[in-house]
């Protein structure tokens, strides 16, 4: 179903560590093949239950730069409860705050499912 989605949301199970020191430690990141798949796709956005696309030690933000130089795409980080969404298609939207002179914002993420 991923090829039919507008947003690709990745449940890695990392949100279970929210509120612990482990959450912002050595979290999982996409490898080059996954990044190439996303860049080649026609997605409007991607989302994850981790703190970022890049490893915490990558101060150059290599994956962020690769993604945004090749795509006009939304990147959503720190999602929670993606395990409740299942593996099929569903409707998803996110609502950011309107902030000036910022490159990011907290959001309200909402998923809903057809009967």
Summary of predicted features, one role per range:
Residues 1-115:
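Active-/binding-site microenvironments in catalytic and ligand-binding cores
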């Amino acid at each position: 179903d991923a090829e039919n989605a507008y947003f690709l949301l990745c449940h890695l199970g990392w949100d279970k560590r929210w509120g612990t020191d482990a959450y912002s430690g050595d979290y999982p990141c996409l490898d080059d093949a996954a990044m190439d798949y996303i860049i080649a796709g026609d997605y409007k956005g991607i989302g994850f239950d981790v703190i970022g696309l890049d490893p915490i030690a990558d101060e150059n933000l290599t994956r962020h730069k690769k993604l945004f130089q090749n795509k006009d795409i939304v990147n959503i980080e720190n999602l929670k409860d993606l395990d409740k969404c299942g593996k099929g298609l569903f409707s998803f939207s996110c609502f950011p705050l309107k902030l000036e002179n910022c490159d990011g914002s907290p959001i309200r993420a909402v998923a809903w499912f057809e009967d």
